[in-house]
C-alpha cells in the first residue's frame, strides 16, 4: 500500500525534491529494486485478451516475461539492478493483510457479477484486483535472475526497508519502487516508474529525501509521524485528519504525542489501542539486510540454463530467449565504463542530515567493503 497521498504532498510542499529523467540518465548506476512490486506490475500489465499469459500447461508466465525483458532493458541502459524480495511481514502488518483478504473477496463477487452481465471493462478491472504475487512467482523469478547473472537479495522482512539499507550503505544509488514508504524507511533516493512499460512513456521520478526534509522543514522522525498520520500499512489513522491538516499539525506540534494532547478527541478520535509508537519504531529501526556485508556481483548469463528453464519448461520462444541472452552479454561489455561522478563520491550514501560531500577516504573505505561476502546475496 505504501503511504496514502505522500507523492502529491511532496509535489505540493517540496517540488524541488522531485526530478524527472529518462532511463538513459541512470547509466552506470546500481539500483535496488522492490521485486514484489515489479512482479505485481508484470502480472497486471503483461496480458493477452485481458488474461495473464499462460503456457500450454496452463502455467502463468506473465511474471517471467516481464522480469526477463524489463531487466534486459535496464541492462541495455547501463543499469546494474539488484532485486530485493520480501521476507516475513512484520506482525503489525497483519491488520492490513486481513483488509486485503476482505478486498479480494469483494472483488471476486463483483467479478462474478460483471461476468454474468458481460461487462468486459469491469471484468478487466476486477480481474486485476485479484492479482496476487505467490511464493511460486517469487521462486521462479529468483531462478530466472540467477540464470541471467543478475543478483538478488532475500530481505529478512520488508523489501523496501532493505533497499533503503543498501542505499544508506553506499552499495546502490537508489531504491526503485512504486510505494512511497521507501522514503519513510530512509532511502536517500527513491525512483518511481523505473520498471514501467516503455509503451506508457512515463518519465522516471526521482525523489531526494534530504531535500524533502529540508523543504518541508521536518526531521526524519517528524516525517515518519507525518506518514503514520497519512496512512501506512502498520496502523490506523486519526479520523478527519487529511494530508493538509496532517502536515500543519506536525509542523505546529512536532510529534503525534503532542498532536494528541492538542486536538479535540471527539472531533478527531484516534484508533483504539493505536499502535503508532510501534509503527514509528518499525520505520526507524526495521529488520534489514546488513548492507555493509552484501557483495553484489553481476555475471555472464547461463544461456543453456535459460533455454532449459524458459523454453523447455516454460515454453517461451527459443529464438527470443537466445536473442535476449545476446543482449545481456552485449550490455555487460558496454557497462564496464563507469560514471564519472562515482570516481569522486560514493553516491547515495550521504545521510539526510549531512550536506557536505564525503571525503575521498570514506569513499575508498566504502569501495573496500564491497568485497565482503554478503549473508543474503543470492546472485549466481
Curated annotation (Swiss-Prot):
Mg(2+) 1 binds at residues 34, 86, 158, 160. It holds the Pfam family XPG_I. Mg(2+) 2 binds at residues 179, 181, 233. Keywords: DNA damage, DNA repair, DNA replication, Endonuclease, Exonuclease, Hydrolase, Magnesium, Metal-binding, Mitochondrion, Nuclease, Nucleus, Phosphoprotein. Residues 122-253 are annotated as: I-domain. PROSITE patterns: XPG_1, XPG_2. CDD domains: PIN_FEN1. Residues 1-104 are annotated as: N-domain. The keyword Nucleus applies. Its cofactor is Mg(2+). Gene3D superfamilies: 5' to 3' exonuclease, C-terminal subdomain (1.10.150.20), 5'-nuclease (3.40.50.1010). GO terms for cellular component: mitochondrion; nucleolus; nucleoplasm; nucleus. One of its GO terms (biological process) is retina development in camera-type eye. Residues 346-380 are annotated as: Disordered. It is found in: Nucleus, Nucleolus; Nucleus, Nucleoplasm; Mitochondrion. Belongs to the XPG/RAD2 endonuclease family. FEN1 subfamily. Structure-specific nuclease with 5'-flap endonuclease and 5'-3' exonuclease activities involved in DNA replication and repair. During DNA replication, cleaves the 5'-overhanging flap structure that is generated by displacement synthesis when DNA polymerase encounters the 5'-end of a downstream Okazaki fragment. It enters the flap from the 5'-end and then tracks to cleave the flap base, leaving a nick for ligation. Also involved in the long patch base excision repair (LP-BER) pathway, by cleaving within the apurinic/apyrimidinic (AP) site-terminated flap. This is Flap endonuclease 1. It comes from Danio rerio. The lineage of its organism: Eukaryota, Metazoa, Chordata, Craniata, Vertebrata. The gene is fen1.
Amino acid at each position: 500500500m505504501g503511504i496514502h497521498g505522500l507523492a502529491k504532498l511532496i509535489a505540493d510542499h517540496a517540488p524541488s525534491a522531485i526530478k524527472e529523467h529518462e532511463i538513459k540518465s541512470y547509466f552506470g548506476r546500481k539500483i535496488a529494486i522492490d521485486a514484489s512490486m515489479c512482479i505485481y506490475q508484470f502480472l497486471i500489465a503483461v496480458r493477452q485478451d485481458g488474461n495473464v499469459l499462460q503456457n500450454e500447461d496452463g502455467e502463468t508466465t506473465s511474471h517471467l516475461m516481464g522480469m526477463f525483458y524489463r531487466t534486459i532493458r535496464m541492462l541495455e541502459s547501463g543499469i546494474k539492478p539488484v532485486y530485493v524480495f520480501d521476507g516475513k511481514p512484520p506482525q503489525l502488518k497483519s491488520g492490513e493483510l486481513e483488509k486485503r483478504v476482505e478486498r479480494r473477496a469483494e472483488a471476486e463477487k463483483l467479478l462474478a457479477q460483471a461476468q454474468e452481465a458481460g461487462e468486459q471493462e469491469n471484468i478487466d478491472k476486477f480481474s486485476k484486483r485479484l492479482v496476487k504475487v505467490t511464493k511460486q512467482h517469487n521462486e521462479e523469478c529468483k531462478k530466472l535472475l540467477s540464470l541471467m547473472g543478475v543478483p538478488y537479495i532475500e530481505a529478512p522482512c520488508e523489501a523496501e526497508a532493505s533497499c533503503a539499507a543498501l542505499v544508506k550503505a553506499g552499495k546502490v544509488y537508489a531504491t526503485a519502487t512504486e510505494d512511497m514508504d521507501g522514503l519513510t524507511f530512509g532511502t536517500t533516493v527513491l525512483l518511481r516508474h523505473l520498471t514501467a512499460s516503455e509503451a506508457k512513456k512515463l518519465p522516471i521520478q526521482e525523489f531526494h529525501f534530504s531535500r524533502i526534509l529540508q523543504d518541508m522543514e521536518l526531521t526524519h522522525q517528524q516525517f515518519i509521524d507525518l506518514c503514520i498520520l497519512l496512512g501506512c500499512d502498520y496502523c490506523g489513522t486519526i479520523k478527519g485528519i487529511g494530508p493538509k491538516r496532517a502536515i500543519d499539525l506536525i509542523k505546529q506540534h512536532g510529534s503525534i504525542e503532542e498532536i494528541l494532547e492538542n486536538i479535540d478527541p471527539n472531533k478527531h478520535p484516534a484508533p483504539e489501542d493505536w499502535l503508532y509508537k510501534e509503527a514509528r519504531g518499525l520505520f526507524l529501526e526495521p529488520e534489514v539486510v546488513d548492507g555493509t556485508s552484501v557483495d553484489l556481483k553481476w555475471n555472464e548469463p547461463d544461456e543453456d540454463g535459460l533455454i532449459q528453464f524458459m523454453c523447455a519448461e516454460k515454453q517461451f520462444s527459443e529464438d527470443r530467449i537466445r536473442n535476449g541472452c545476446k543482449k545481456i552479454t552485449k550490455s555487460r561489455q558496454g557497462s564496464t565504463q563507469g560514471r564519472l561522478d562515482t570516481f569522486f563520491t560514493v553516491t547515495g550514501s550521504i545521510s539526510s542530515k549531512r550536506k557536505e560531500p564525503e571525503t575521498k577516504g570514506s569513499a575508498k573505505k566504502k569501495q573496500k567493503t564491497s568485497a565482503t561476502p554478503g549473508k543474503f546475496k543470492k546472485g549466481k
